[in-house]
Each structure stands twice: as C-alpha cells, then as structure tokens.
Amino acid sequence: MDEYKIKTVEEGLTKIQFPEFDKISSDAPVFYNPHMELNRDISILALQTFQKQEDRNINICDLFGGSGIRGVRYKNEIDGVGHVFINDISETANEYERHNVELNNLKDIEIFQHDASMFLRMHRGEFDVIDIDPFGTPSPFLDSAGYCSRRNSLLCVTATDTSALCGTYKEPCIRKYNAKPYKSEYCHETGIRILAGFVALTLAKYSKSIEVKLSHSTEHYMRLYIEVKKGSKKSDECLKNIGYLSHCKHCLYREENKGLATSTPDICPECGEKLIQAGPLWLGEIQNEEFISKMIVESENKKLNTKEDVLKLLESCRIEAKSPATFYDVHKICKILKISAPKLDLVFGNLEKEGFEAVKTHFNPLGIKTNAPLKKIKEIIKTLSSSN
C-alpha cells in the first residue's frame, strides 16, 4: 500500500482510503468511482427497505469490491446486516478492502479473491442480497447469480454498457443480452427493459422469477433492484411479461406485443410505414410504488451526501410506477409535425382534462408517460401550438 499516494473520502457514515488516480478506469490499481455515490446511496435505502420487509438479518455479497466502499457501507450503515462478503479478483483491491474494514472498526466482513462467477457458485444459497456492479456488462455473471440466488432474495444489477442496451451499437446488445435494441427517443427505458428481460429469462432456467422493485437510468449506467422468487409456476407467469416493442419512426406510433414467441406487426396502423421491433424485453412493471415509497421514508433515517438528488429521482420513479411502457418526447412529436413546441405543463394539463393519465419520467425531462393514444396527444399539441 505504501507505493501509492493515498486519497481519503467519506460517503454517508463511512470513510475509505484508496490509491489516488488521474482518471476513472478499470486499469486503476483499486477501482473507486465518485460518480457512483448516488448509486450507492440509493442502494443503502433499497437494501434497508428490503431488510425491514424480510424482518431478519441479511447476508450481502458485494461481487466486485474494488476499494470496498459498497460492501463496507452496507455493513456500516444498514441495520440488520449479518455478514458481508466482499469479492475482487485483484490482490491489491483485497488489501485496501481489508484496510477499509479496519478503518471503520467493522466485524463480520469477509474478503475474498476469486473469479466472480466461481465465487457465487462456491457460496450457493448463502446470500440474501447479491450486488453485481461490474465495469461494463453484467451479462457474464447473471447465470451464476440466477443459479445461486436464494428464495426471496434481492438481486441488484448495474450495467454501464449503455451504448449497447440503447441501440447505438446493435450487435453487442444481441451478443450480450440476446435482444435487438432500437435507438429511439425512449432508448434508455428500452435498455432497462432489455436488461430486466434478460435477467428474467436467465433466472427462469432455474425456476426462479423476478419482481422489479426499482430501476433507473442515470448518467452512464442503468441499475435494477429485483426481488427473486422461486417456483416453476411463478416463473411461467413471470415470462408472460416478456415480449417486444414495435415502433414507427415516421409517426412515432408504438405498441407492446407480449409473449416470447408472439407474432409482431410489420405495418404501422397509423401511417402504413414499416414497424421496427425491439426485444425480447420486459413489459411488466419496472417500478414498485410501495417499495419506493418505503425507500423515501427510510431516507429520513440515513446520512446521504446526495440525498436531494436521491429523493428527486425516487419520487420521479414512484410517480411513473403505474404508467404504460415507453413515453412520448414532446419536442420529437413537434419536429415530425413541423410545429413549435408548447409548454410541457400545458400538454399535461390538457391530457388530464381529457380524462387521461399523464406523468413525467426520469428517463427524459421532455417525456410524457400517458395512456392517451398518439392521435389524441398530437391533436392536443397541435391545438396548443397554434394558440401560442
């Protein structure tokens, strides 16, 4: 440890030290990403909410420990935590993980140096929470996570390969997630749904099902919090939420087609142009209103450096919990209609006056999630634009 210049940071109630580096990279001697503090703060609330829901001590696996910040915070800041298992293939990372455990005077944290998938299989059924936060895609580790996850456990998954999931690079998404993406105005939501669908299909091999408690797309990454259930019947029901999205890039019509082996339409019923499909992906709920509400309440009991941003994000996710898949970008619609964009609040207000539900989305500040048909949305936008 003496060969590096040491940096000290504090997150929540936890202090850690690690080698200072010029830029965030997987080549750093020990990985620490300051931009993921929001992610870790949200995780503290999610795991505490899960622990209280289960009403028992929980054992946690931090699969990619890096500096140890995530695993150490879990033990230091969450009530009802039994053992924390921190794993990293790097010997240098292991040294700093042990150092940071001692720095915070913690017990019941074990440090391991194993291949991630091998580590999970060595400890099958021992974890109540498995947190997969890799540098890049989580895809190679989800099979082992699915095989090893216990009944009524929590699976937390981060993906930083957003260019693949969002459809900027189609082939990597097909290769890693067995799904075709599409780069639309709602591509970040599509990416979340592709990731959730891949998790569901992977766990189904082991007669396990998923319930998405919270998901968000923030900056350079996507994050899922998934409760894992066991049983073949539950798994069969779960797979009914897998399907495809059909999208028209000419008029912005879209529709859901549930079913892994379902037929999908080729022609847009609105304008007659060719439809583009994305999937297979998850068409079930990607936010759980009750769980998120409990997380918001839990924030009152926690010291979080990013609390303001955390609460803003959680409230947005809570509001969109019951809304349909995908959203409409008002400016994109106006561009197609070749009209000026009205104020967003007026669009919301007029949709609600017409008896439709309409909420904002954390995926896009210009997005509207609504159960109104596209024709009605365009009609309202045209009327408002002409009266500007």
From Swiss-Prot:
Keywords: Metal-binding, Methyltransferase, RNA-binding, S-adenosyl-L-methionine, Transferase, tRNA processing, tRNA-binding, Zinc. The gene is trm1. Belongs to the class I-like SAM-binding methyltransferase superfamily. Trm1 family. This is tRNA (guanine(26)-N(2))-dimethyltransferase. CDD domains: AdoMet_MTases. S-adenosyl-L-methionine binds at residues 40, 70, 88, 115-116. Zn(2+) binds at residues 248, 251, 268, 271. Its EC number is 2.1.1.216. NCBIfam families: TRM1. It comes from the Archaea. Residues 7-381 form the Trm1 methyltransferase domain.
